[in-house]
């Protein structure tokens, strides 16, 4: 019993002598395609021709048979040379094996086989396949909407529009028909991807008698019929290919919506100059400095007293005494010496608080560039009484002269005009 089973297993593995090339193959693989010549040869219904070693002799090209044998085992090797591919196709036709000529043929065969086994529509299988690669199945076609009506001896035929998708064409038909699309007088028929609407008072049987080749309509062009006495209208949405070669068309990649975060990441990943973004005005009068006492101010750019603070100090008699002793250059950002009035512009913060003129802070060794002039509107700091006339005293033509305390590198000016040293 065991010897009989072993003999059957040995018979399932066959030795082949194809054009002098020796191969070993399973009977099941050779009979993979039921309608092929190999399946008929090794089905057991016909005697096999063998050589001295017992191998089955097949008088064909042994080198090309290797491609077919690998294909029967589930492997596909497509030759690169055109001459070899043509010769291989002849061998495949001789044995009745659907060997693919190219990779696209192989994918098409596998897709059709998968659709039949899984009971899935081929179009959906192709769509899923393209979705896996982020591609869209596209064919260069347009949809043409024809209109035709006949009444007695008159006939009118025209094109309503050309559309890029069938959905746009269907919407155009709905717009043309309006409420008549659901009428009993409307007859709809389809052929392939094309659709036709016929409006008349005739029944379908009567239309078949009047219209030429009514049942043989394949959706191509407009169907003409024998001229009846009643009015008949016809709308035909036909798919037409664009002129040109498909070989030059590249696959269209799917468009996807990019989230703002992804777009920001994509912009940051790019090299080169980044786009300039508006972050508000270049200057701001709402500047608050914390721990201002710890900021070291350079002597050359020490804050200068403004006219109202000078007038307040002039009440004590010190400003007049120091006016001819020293001349300090104008600080950066307070205007030009020829235009002293530029430092007293009407611009001011909304809360009306008094701010100090800008000072050059030594935060680094880099040379500070001149800033824009900040025009501030200041409230009077003068008290009532004897100091009141000093506020209305006209300023001298030149820039105000500071007291010697203003030249102290450690001094800072407060809002009331007093010097505060650390």
UniProtKB/Swiss-Prot annotation:
<dbReference type="Pfam" id="PF02214">
    <property type="entry name" value="BTB_2"/>
</dbReference>
<dbReference type="InterPro" id="IPR045704">
    <property type="entry name" value="KCTD18_C"/>
</dbReference>
<feature type="compositionally biased region" description="Polar residues">
    <location>
        <begin position="413"/>
        <end position="422"/>
    </location>
</feature>
<dbReference type="Pfam" id="PF19321">
    <property type="entry name" value="KCTD18_C"/>
</dbReference>
<feature type="region of interest" description="Disordered">
    <location>
        <begin position="289"/>
        <end position="357"/>
    </location>
</feature>
<dbReference type="InterPro" id="IPR011333">
    <property type="entry name" value="SKP1/BTB/POZ_sf"/>
</dbReference>
<dbReference type="GO" id="GO:0051260">
    <property type="term" value="P:protein homooligomerization"/>
</dbReference>
<feature type="domain" description="BTB">
    <location>
        <begin position="12"/>
        <end position="80"/>
    </location>
</feature>
<protein>
    <recommendedName>
        <fullName>BTB/POZ domain-containing protein KCTD18</fullName>
    </recommendedName>
</protein>
<feature type="compositionally biased region" description="Pro residues">
    <location>
        <begin position="396"/>
        <end position="406"/>
    </location>
</feature>
<feature type="region of interest" description="Disordered">
    <location>
        <begin position="376"/>
        <end position="422"/>
    </location>
</feature>
<dbReference type="InterPro" id="IPR003131">
    <property type="entry name" value="T1-type_BTB"/>
</dbReference>
């Amino acid at each position: 019993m065991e010897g009989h089973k072993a003999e059957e297993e040995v018979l399932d593995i066959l030795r082949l002598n194809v054009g002098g090339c020796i191969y070993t193959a399973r009977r099941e693989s050779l009979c993979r395609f039921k309608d092929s010549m190999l399946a008929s040869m090794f089905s057991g219904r016909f005697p096999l021709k063998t050589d001295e070693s017992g191998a089955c002799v097949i008088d064909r090209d042994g080198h090309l048979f290797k491609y077919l044998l690998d294909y029967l085992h589930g492997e596909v090797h497509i030759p690169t040379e055109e001459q070899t591919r043509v010769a291989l196709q002849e061998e495949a036709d001789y044995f009745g094996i659907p060997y693919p000529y190219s990779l696209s043929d192989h994918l098409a065969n596998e897709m059709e086989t998968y659709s039949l086994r899984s009971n899935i529509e081929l179009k959906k299988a192709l769509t899923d396949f393209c979705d896996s690669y982020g591609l869209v199945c596209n064919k260069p076609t347009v949809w043409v909407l024809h209109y035709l009506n006949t009444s007695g001896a008159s006939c009118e035929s025209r094109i309503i529009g050309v559309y890029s998708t069938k959905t746009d064409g269907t919407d155009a038909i709905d717009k043309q028909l309006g409420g008549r699309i659901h009428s009993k007088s409307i007859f709809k028929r389809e052929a392939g991807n094309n659709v036709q609407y016929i409006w008349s008072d005739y029944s379908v049987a009567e239309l078949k008698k009047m219209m030429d080749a009514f049942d043989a309509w394949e959706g191509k062009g407009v169907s003409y019929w024998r001229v009846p006495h009643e009015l008949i209208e016809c709308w035909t949405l036909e798919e037409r290919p664009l002129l040109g070669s498909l070989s030059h068309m590249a696959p269209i990649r799917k468009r996807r919506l990019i989230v703002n975060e992804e777009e920001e990441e994509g912009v940051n990943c790019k090299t080169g100059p980044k786009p300039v973004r508006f972050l508000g005005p270049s200057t701001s009068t709402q500047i608050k400095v914390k721990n201002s006492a710890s900021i070291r101010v350079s002597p050359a750019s020490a804050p200068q007293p403004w006219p109202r603070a000078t007038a307040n100090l002039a009440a004590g008699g010190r400003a007049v005494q120091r006016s001819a002793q020293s001349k300090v250059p104008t600080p950066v950002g307070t205007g030009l010496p020829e235009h002293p009035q530029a430092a007293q512009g009407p611009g001011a913060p909304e809360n009306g608080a008094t701010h100090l003129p800008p000072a050059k802070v030594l935060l680094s060794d880099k040379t500070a560039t001149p800033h824009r002039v900040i025009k501030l509107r200041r409230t009077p700091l003068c008290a009532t009484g004897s100091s009141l006339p000093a506020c209305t005293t006209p300023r001298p033509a030149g820039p105000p002269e500071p007291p010697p305390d203003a030249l102290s590198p450690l001094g800072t000016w407060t809002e009331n005009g007093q010097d505060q040293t650390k």
